[in-house]
Amino acid sequence: MTSTMTQGLERIPDQMGYLVMSEDGGVLASAGDLENDERLAGVIREMVAVACSFRDLGDQQPFKRMSIVFGEHTFLVTISGQKIYVVKRQNVVREPISV
């Protein structure tokens, strides 16, 4: 059974797993490759804290999203409603278009 907090995450194409965290980094929900991954939650929380600190340096745009791209997968991080949503998504390699 999915909760309203995670129902949209489960429908993301090529999704390999997800974490929903509180602002302090506590895991509220998880599934797939990221199920109960407290270590990754801590790392992501630190990265979010650093990204949020840029606002103090004069950047007026609030931090909302961050992508961490690796060769075969990407972590998509979004802050919404005092929660941090992390989705691990498989990168789909596409052939270049010839024109």
Curated annotation (Swiss-Prot):
Q: Which UniProt keywords apply?
A: Lysosome, Phosphoprotein
Similarity remark: Belongs to the LAMTOR4 family.
Subunit and interaction comment:
Part of the Ragulator complex composed of lamtor1, lamtor2, lamtor3, lamtor4 and lamtor5. The Ragulator complex interacts with slc38a9; the probable amino acid sensor. Component of the lysosomal folliculin complex (LFC).
Main site of residence?
A: other
Phosphoprotein found in the keyword field: yes
Xref: InterPro entries: LAMTOR4
Name the record gives this protein = Ragulator complex protein LAMTOR4
**Lineage of this protein's species?**
Eukaryota, Metazoa, Chordata, Craniata, Vertebrata
Record flagged with keyword Phosphoprotein: yes
Question: What is the gene name?
Answer: lamtor4
Q: Name one GO biological process term.
A: positive regulation of TORC1 signaling
Q: Single GO cellular component annotation?
A: lysosome
Described function:
As part of the Ragulator complex it is involved in amino acid sensing and activation of mTORC1, a signaling complex promoting cell growth in response to growth factors, energy levels, and amino acids. Activated by amino acids through a mechanism involving the lysosomal V-ATPase, the Ragulator plays a dual role for the small GTPases Rag (RagA/RRAGA, RagB/RRAGB, RagC/RRAGC and/or RagD/RRAGD): it (1) acts as a guanine nucleotide exchange factor (GEF), activating the small GTPases Rag and (2) mediates recruitment of Rag GTPases to the lysosome membrane.
Q: Please state where this protein is localized.
A: Lysosome
